[in-house]
């Protein structure tokens, strides 16, 4: 069973290794507890839809050019792990971090943003009561944040940041937007043709 020290050693060791850029994770997804995963899985969904693959073994990276990693890093229970994760982020190849936390003391996004600076950190309040904690950063300590539970949007924002350097991601972002536009058109026509009562019945049966 791995210990916190094992994970700290892993991050520190990985930070010293020379790997091709394509073999390093571009986006890091972290959360304070595995109970946050249902909310944070939206980021996984968005990145996967945009052609990213999840890196689960640093020594055996996916074939995809763009990858992400996922970890549980608690600001309160494992502050040393959080510090090491954020401090080594740049040297491990990360360009953006998506950090989610719940409760009224949702400190993981804020602390990560402070330590990983200048790497951009996108905070995801897992619950409504976490919003004030996540966005409450003082002047000079920036963090970007989405609304409660919107980890999907956080991932889109992360890819928008990466797209400034990678034109192919611009095309992927435009494609996913066009898919959503088509969804609206399809639903609109279906509602019009079926009528409100029938449309609602069919939607309830789906």
Model-predicted segments: where are they?
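Glycine-rich phosphate/diphosphate-binding loop of Rossmann-like nucleotide-binding domains
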Residues: 15-68, 72-75
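Short, ordered loop/turn segments at secondary-structure junctions
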Residues: 33-34, 73-75, 102-103, 126-129, ...
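Short glycine/serine/threonine-rich phosphate/pyrophosphate-binding segments
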Residues: 36-40, 79-81, 104-111, 131, ...
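Short, acidic/small-residue loops that bind anionic groups at enzyme active sites
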Residues: 112-149, 172
